[in-house]
Regions:
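Short, well-ordered alpha-helical microsegments
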Residues: 1-5, 94-99, 181-184
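N-terminal binding-site loop/beta-alpha segment at the start of enzyme catalytic domains
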Residues: 1-17, 74
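Active-site phosphate/pyrophosphate- and oxyanion-stabilizing loops and adjacent acidic/basic residues
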Residues: 3-7, 38, 99-100, 164
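Structured C-terminal cap/extension of enzyme domains
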Residues: 7-9, 104, 127-240
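Short hydrophobic/aromatic-enriched beta-strand-loop microsegments
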Residues: 15-19, 107-114, 195-201
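N-terminal small/glycine-rich loop or linker at the start of catalytic domains
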Residues: 16-23, 53-56
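Conserved residues at beta->alpha junctions
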Residues: 24, 91-92, 175-178
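Glycine/proline-rich, positively charged
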Residues: 27-128, 134-141
Length: 240
């Protein structure tokens, strides 16, 4: 995938995009983090990424591992060498882990979190983490805007209404997968033509979702290991 990305960024397109690199070194150690970083630069065919983002910070000891195992040192070294500009992190499971990272005293540049109308009711990143990130001036990327497709299965709001809900939050970008060009074009059109929901409309969308959102049945990535990576499970002592 990174090689394909490199091909797409030739002929001047690299300067027109912001590249966020997600570090998949789940032991959070210096050596593996830096090795993966260098390999990704080579595959993409660039000398820098804009943001280094630590992926899948979902275990309570992940914040300590970043410090104790040297992963954060690797990112700071890459920034000192001007091979990245900013440092961030992502996770999909527990708002309190995001808060733990935000409150550790490190000046994060980016945070990625699952935001959608279901999240507002269940273990909510929108209510617990988003205000703190905004207060600190940290850029936010909304992930899982349709809850991995669960919004469509829940049949309480349309997927396009869920996207519009996320676009109306104080975020820098919304990350939404598309499995074909038609859906991609539809999402892009919505992103460039939507009218933000006002506060009353946001509340109405939340209310529509509340009856099926409270037990987390449509956000199982928060409460189960079904969506955790095999490598992440293994390094934390779980059987993938």
């Amino acid at each position: 995938v990174e090689k394909w990305l490199g091909l797409a960024l030739k002929d001047g397109y690299r300067e027109r995009v912001m590249l966020v690199w997600q570090c998949g070194a789940y032991r959070r150690d210096y050596k593996t983090s830096m090795q993966q970083f260098d390999e990704s630069l080579r595959r993409v065919g660039t000398d820098r990424f804009d943001i280094w983002s630590f992926g899948e910070l979902i275990y309570d000891n992940d914040p300590e591992w970043l410090d104790d195992h040297g992963g954060l040192d690797a990112a700071q070294e890459a920034r000192d060498e001007k091979r990245i500009v900013g440092i961030g992190f992502s996770g999909h499971k527990a708002p309190h882990i995001h808060m733990k990272l935000l409150q550790r005293g490190f000046a994060w540049d980016l945070v990625q979190m699952p935001l959608n109308p279901l999240d507002a009711t269940y273990r909510s990143f929108e209510r617990q983490v988003l205000p703190e990130a905004v207060k600190r001036g940290i850029a936010v990327i909304s992930t899982k805007p349709i809850a991995g497709g669960a919004i469509a299965r829940a049949k309480v709001v349309k997927p396009e209404d869920a996207l519009r809900y996320c676009f109306s939050l104080p975020v820098s970008s919304v990350q939404c997968a598309a499995d074909d060009r038609a859906l991609l074009k539809k999402n892009l059109k919505l992103a460039t033509t939507y009218t933000p929901y006002h506060a009353g409309e946001m509340d109405l969308v939340r209310q529509k979702c509340r009856p099926v959102a409270g037990d987390g049945r449509f956000e199982r990535y928060k409460s189960t290991q079904e969506f955790d990576s095999p490598l992440g499970l293994a390094v934390h002592g779980f059987r993938p």
